[in-house]
Amino acid sequence: MHQTVHRVFGHLFKFCRIAGGTYTPSSGHSLCILKGISLLRGTDEYGPMGNMKENKKSSGTQSIWMGSSVEAASRPLDRSLDTDVCIVGAGIAGLSTAYSLSCEGKSVVVLDDGPIGGGMTERTTAHLSNVIDDGYVTIERLHGKHGARMAADSHTAAIDRIETIVVTERFDCDFERVDGFLFPAPGHPPERLEEERLAALRAGLVGVERIERPAGPVLETGGCLRFPRQAQFHPVKFVTGLAQAIERCGGRIFTDAHVSTVKGGQQARIETRQGHAIVAQSVVVATNTPVNDMVVVHTKQAPYTTYVLGAGVPKDSVPVALYWDQADPYHYVRIQKDAAANGHDLLIVGGEDHKTGQANDGAQRYQRLEHWARKRFPMMEQIEYRWSGQVMEPTDGLALIGRNPDDTSNVYIATGDSGMGMTHGMIAGMLITDLIQERANDWAALYDPSRKSLKSIGTFVQENLNVAAQYADWVSAGDIGSEDQIPKDSGAVLRSGVQKVAVYRDEEGTVHRRSAVCPHLKCIVAWDSIERTWNCPCHGSRFDAYGKVLNGPANSDLSPIET
């Protein structure tokens, strides 16, 4: 464990040295930091949601998108293969890349250990926007005016590309162009909105205007900005359509194929847990967060959990649009037409973000989110969906798309979605295709995973100190004193001698024990009582109640307990 902390601090030191900092990764210094920061985790005894629909895919809650797609002809991998490009991950980033490459004649193999779109793609709220989450004032400060223009251009192009694919391939995925409305945070001076409007215009967005109030809801007083030509769609229907189009172009998609090893070289080699291997000219790892990178990329982004409610509203009572505010954490809202149980529209509201694995108070967060929503949407009916998703937040606000740092030139990654996974995923499809085809791309430097943004060093240091602090859990007591205190369908971390044990009691009362040590970089996992998962507070790895890995960067299950 001590060696792992040093690896994290070693990368912190390298970054600080480049920026002129003075941090020294000495043993005493790192231990002082660990002693000086205490971690408090709340407890949450909130049981299963009254209206929650069971999901056996990626976690314990179910989004509106789950279970609504037509199956593509995916199948388990039963043999080794050669191909031009192997893509690991069948979400929007992986399938967008596979679609573009297969349309250009490349032979493509896609591998995923779950169903198509079964990761974070089915847990998004599917806003398609060129309004950067961190705001253009921040993006311009961190990346300059040219960088802000490239960010605006790439997200605009991503929406246009999605629309073109929908029309060309005739996808039935509820794609619709809508306006977006950005509201100020409570108490923010009105100048903030005007600064953001001017920065957006400098970045090249067209038609951004300040209005006193939209035709629909008012999230906060003080006016708002209207951004035209945003969009929304049904994400699982879209990626299912992509999968079918890929297969029509000769691409092959294999599910239930857990990739255990990714090796670059003159030819890349991708090995699966089942013992098969794919040999490819290039490999793209598009798994939300890379499973082939131990440290470097994970010091440049941080995992956050975000919460979503879906509630019926009378038809046409809320105009179809995207709505956001500038609160911290911010709220985001959209409408899905005719999607409520009674045929009404479904209001989708998200927010209440926190660092993954560092809070277990999901019930309270849902309650706060509901209170916020009902105050602004008094027509809200019964809540029909509650779900959460994981967002990878890069320290400088933009995704990490391109060649994997410290790797061979034929290994590519797409990560750091920053709450804009749908457009960043499509950007990955366009950018990585150009890189593999050896074409110039104006966005390449902006999204380069090896970039160093010195202006974001404060966030970089803060996030990595937060990671280091989590190793204090090694010397802390367990969540409770005895596994007898664990109710059915719940879990807790217990101390057993020098070991930390993740204990889950299933609905029948049977106890299941796994090591609580995350196999990625040895942090201690925490129980998530809403999703019924074990979550790593360092880099966001997630495991089901029985210890099976769901999300990277960990690439293996929680270990059995040694007796």
Regions inferred by a protein language model and the residue ranges of each:
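Rossmann-like flavin
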Residues: I139-A245
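Flavin-dependent oxidoreductases
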Residues: T261-Q336, Q470-W474, G478, D484
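Rieske [2Fe-2S] iron-sulfur-binding domain
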Residues: L309, A492-T563
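N-terminal Rossmann-like FAD-binding beta1-loop-alpha1 element of flavoenzymes
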Residues: V85-V110
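Helical element adjacent to the flavin cofactor pocket in flavoenzyme catalytic cores
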Residues: L225-Q274, Q281
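C-terminal catalytic lobe of FAD-dependent flavoproteins
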Residues: D328, K355-F460, R514
